[in-house]
């Protein structure tokens, strides 16, 4: 066998890495990717053309192999192998080489036989010359006719082919021909020019490209390429197309791809801004556009300079030409973009970028000035300008490494022990720190904490005397404590506490004292206020203690002075209050309030306050110093006076109602009488030991009774907020015309107004649309004058585009499509729009019947037609169509003359109103029938019907047949035949919803639409990790519980499946399965109905389609518009116009998907990467950004390697040389930009880091963030340019909005009742909830997608999210916090909607709620919320609290109220106090009863009812509410209350917050019992068991009555215990129960855990993970955990005195002590048993059994003795169990908290055994009732109806699905 020639590596990749016939170029190891992949791709292109050339290209790849030295002696192969990877040490390299080699050995002979020339060298030369002749030369001859992508592809291919040719010639010692060398030199030069581009092709031959012909882009290009005044570095070769960015790259050493990326970014930014301005000089860059961009881009930098007291580095030459000044502005602007584009993770630190930019801009200024100076000296070079990539390695990398090192500490450390992004950024807010850091950055500065050697900085610098440590937290420390709630919102808590004190004083003294005395006592609230102020000052110092060394001097002084002042007032207030004259105390109060008077007075004049707060003037700062900390952010946030008045009135009404209700009805006044009576009642029958015997007036009882009342007082504001916000939101929505069109009937009634509304809203119009209150009361619409007008044509094309989109999405059938489409052809004699047939349904048959019955009564018929405009239009159109049809069908002059005469007579009678009187229309129904038959025959156009047609024509007028316009005949036929059935068109509920919402939105307030050229440009960004892209055939057919996803979707969407079959022209599923190529269509159909990336991409790419159509409307003339956009798209004559439309759309819109793992998926052959590539091929404008991890081997370091990271952007590569057009699998991507990073970019929260990586590739002035489980619609895309105009309108505010909030539609609501509950809850939040947040409250933030950001504003202020680990878990809302703190404004708009998928299973929903609760817990600790709470005015602060963490805190108080109430009652009944009090506690229960379900009903139901009522009618809202209750919605919401409570408290106490991926799948399948137990054990089951025991004890010893509040607690207990099983599909199926029991037993087995065993497999592993958070909790968290665990000992303390031996006999503490002795003996016994089991259980089983029997007998002997002596009664055994269970659990909690102290093998093993026993018993007790109910089949049927009732109403036959499961299983069992 011949030795394989050198370089043979290509096709072997394929045989091992990918099982196809040719190699996959995408599976090359990352270390070889850059060199090998281009060769493999070219090989694939030429494979079928010349197989030997393919093989020879493989030969060149073989040169990477040295470890298998087949070609020893060939020095070139060895050299190249050593150069790339001589030891094959790279990841997968050896495997790659071996596989290639195997293929080469197999295919060498076959390729030799196919060789056409005498040698490989001649073969390769022949092919190269052929390629040059046929490829390159044809390309050069084509010139402008070829696209830039084609040119790029061909030149890249030619370069690769030459490399192979050169290698083969050198191997054969043959010189390459001179002609080929000359050709190659030219190709090499061209290849450097024609590089892959993103949007703008900037190569010289692209001047005729539609985008490059735009005068604005030409002007910007001309401006940035003006470099004649710039001095280049010595040796630099200047090219004609170089620009100012190239100069900046050369001087500051930026990366090439960064420069290319920001060049396009800058060009598009400037061009888009210039498009909106009035042109002065069309071919020159307008200074106004440049100033606008520069001001917005560098606005934050200028503010920063003013704040830190630095002179701006933006300095411009005086008395210079405009070109020079403009060039300087471009340099400054470009410099910032280049810094930002290469800053990587530093983009989260905007002021750090300001610091870098400040120094680099000053160096730029010095360079430019030195060049223009008259003095002769060498121009100054930048500090970091030595080598390529110096900016990355010397500026970005040191800061990045500091971030990375700090992030490593975040793993298990406390927030206070490491610096997050905000801490590091705030370092740059202080000039003293900037001076310490210096420029160039000092390696030993306290910012870094690293040595200069580690950072690679200048080691020769002298170290300043800064100490060895690094600076810590600067302005804020996140301490994990509940006190953050008081510290952040101290004014609110002070208000509540002082109001409560005042109300109690008034109620207590209402009848006993005079008004003056009561007033004097009420004034004592200021003493309390002083104490609260001191407490707040103490909290500020305590929680900032760890930052005491690093915070600025003025901040320290402020804290100290506030504490001292507060302490002084705490002393002065009581002294002055005790003075006999009240006036002195009032004077003291006025003096006390004076420091805060100025800010509160300025609240009424917000403009002055904003000015003062934003001022950096020292005297002003001194005045504001007391009330406002000197921070860079959080200043000037106040709204306009009108906005302040609105939310002030909102809160005045709310607080007045709340306080009045609390005082008069609920809490204060009604309780005063019972409280006084309790305090006066003696307590002789006290059963328990008294710890405080000298306390008088039963104060302990009063505290016990009042504690839950106080908690309710602090909690019920949330309920009042729900009430008031619902009313305000509903009223506001009604004025905004929400829900005006609710049904198809309403749509039909107002459809004729749609063209006018469309014209007013979506067509650029000089007339200003009505807004505000004028629009709220207006129903007037613009009218379209006639059918031949441009507006009518635009509306019909837009409407038809929407309807066609419905058909493509299979929402409507072909027949519905025909009924919904509008005719695009107009009759000259008709003066109205030809409406869709569904609007005219049954009008013709009715009109015919009316005409027959009204024979002779023409005026009556005319009046009927005048009243029904649709009927009139239908009759007139039908008449015109028949006239046209007959004139077309009939030939012959005499026949035509006869027809003309007949129609002339009819027209004459119509004009004279004598049609019915002069003509007999009684035969009109027969004539109607004949025309129906005629249209049917003509439509079918069959030869056999020609005789029939002739017969019909003879009956109506002797006509002949002729083929005419089919669409017109179709429409006429539908007009004649369609009756009542079309009244329900479309039948699909989703299509109805979308049509009604779109139509309704046209009557809502929105900005006018600008022309496409004048609209703001924008991008959409979707972060994607590893979710489903496109369902595979395997996934669709794989059965889960006997049901496949495809089968499930077919039942969920039966009408859409039927429409799909109709679209692909398959009558049955069998026909569908028989056609292979339709499998891809099935995958798409299913993916469009799931939460997949494919669905999201399709929706977002509707933007492109909408913009192209709108651009066509703007650019087309009358004639082109009448032809329609489709004719322009299809015809060659319209290609130029359509190319211009596409170019405009590309300029205005960019879509980037941030696929973080794309390169990993691609190199591993993951199907998700191929599906993403398919999306890029389907949508050429789609771009994918990803993180590329490239391994590079160090040749001289014995095979060591290093990973480098890149931000990369790819698009679908052009397929120039695809030999088989049907080969859809030959798809490749093409790297556009690849920007090197300083290290792994994911060092914080993954999602925001992923967004940050991709944001540099977005374009435009706005950025829409879209999640990968969202959907979009073509009709909504038409309104995007209106929405973007909101950025240019203040809408009554003082600032332009920086975030535009949009409403969402939850499209997963139909899956199950849980999905319905969740979607209703979510829908009310994203509509009425956010409506109120935005207006009037002005506290809407960013709650995720699909909000639209002011992109330039946010990219200079930290991005669209925050990424610090854990603290920014809810990364979205922090973007809203950040925007508001930096003087941004967030608005909300409901005339546009985006689809959103939500979780559909209980476990999914609970994980989502857990994530949000965790995030809210972290928000509570955050600096953002603290600053908002302090910088907002009082009323806006209240809004901020109750709409963020306040909701979760009030949910926590709701549950705590239950605990406090029950433990209080436990104390009362066990101590005998309740018996002494009689009926007094009844009052407490009555008051608390109103709070039981109010929280759930009002917080969840009220907004839902209001919003559903607005949008669909209040009858439907009431019906839905009742139906939700029948489907146990109260159970669901009560259960979720427990989820919020558990995870919010756990996060605040111990941390442990983490991202919880909920999945995007269809979760309607059964969850195992063990899985539910693991997830809900500690969050619900344990707490429910505790409450159940409390209720049980209370009912045993308490009164016999059962109050409403007690019933509600029992309901909560039952819900928390059994809701997971009640909402679990097939939860009561017996076969599932059996399987669950087996799985539970396997999981709960003791000692089956250990290292590496996942929690899903072992109870031990799960338990260790469950208590893991305690190991990392702080000391205070452990103390609080232990303190709360002590509550379980109350059971033992109370119940031990209820034993028959001690009851009413002994009340000494020795009884309680003796009980502990018994417990310790019992625990010791358990320990002995556990020890014996471990030591003797295996080898000495007999001895172990003897020990167990002995202990058992001893226990029984003692028990029988006690029973015999009557020391223990049977009921005492039960009481002992009730006391022992909580006590043991309390000991277990304490032991778990103290694990580091007691982690001895013996002790910890005992703890584990105790925990295992509790879980075993609790799980078994839970399982018993479930198994019992599974015996009864009707329970399972009821559960199925309850879970899936909503789906039943939409045609979902869940019973068929479940029966399919059972049949499937039974068939398996039989097999």
From Swiss-Prot:
Which terms under GO biological process does the entry name?
(1->3)-beta-D-glucan biosynthetic process; cell wall organization; regulation of cell shape
Topology within the bilayer: Multi-pass membrane protein
Q: Which residues lie on this side of the membrane: Cytoplasmic?
A: 1-491, 543-558, 605-640, 725-1441, 1507-1516, 1697-1708, 1763-1772, 1837-1871
Q: What class of enzyme is it?
A: transferase
Q: Which reaction does it catalyse?
A: [(1->3)-beta-D-glucosyl](n) + UDP-alpha-D-glucose = [(1->3)-beta-D-glucosyl](n+1) + UDP + H(+)
Q: Which residues lie on this side of the membrane: Extracellular?
A: 513-521, 580-583, 662-701, 1463-1485, 1538-1580, 1623-1675, 1730-1741, 1794-1815
Give Gene Ontology CC terms.
1,3-beta-D-glucan synthase complex; plasma membrane
- Residues crossing the lipid bilayer are 492-512, 522-542, 559-579, 584-604, 641-661, 702-724, 1442-1462, 1486-1506, 1517-1537, 1581-1601, 1602-1622, 1676-1696, 1709-1729, 1742-1762, 1773-1793, 1816-1836
Q: Name one GO molecular function term.
A: 1,3-beta-D-glucan synthase activity
Pfam families xref list: FKS1_dom1, Glucan_synthase
Q: Which PANTHER family match?
A: CALLOSE SYNTHASE 2-RELATED (PTHR12741:SF70), LYST-INTERACTING PROTEIN LIP5 DOPAMINE RESPONSIVE PROTEIN DRG-1 (PTHR12741)
Purpose of the protein: Involved in callose synthesis at the forming cell plate during cytokinesis. During plant growth and development, callose is found as a transitory component of the cell plate in dividing cells, is a major component of pollen mother cell walls and pollen tubes, and is found as a structural component of plasmodesmatal canals.
**Designated name of the protein:** Callose synthase 4
Q: Which organism is it from?
A: Arabidopsis thaliana (Mouse-ear cress)
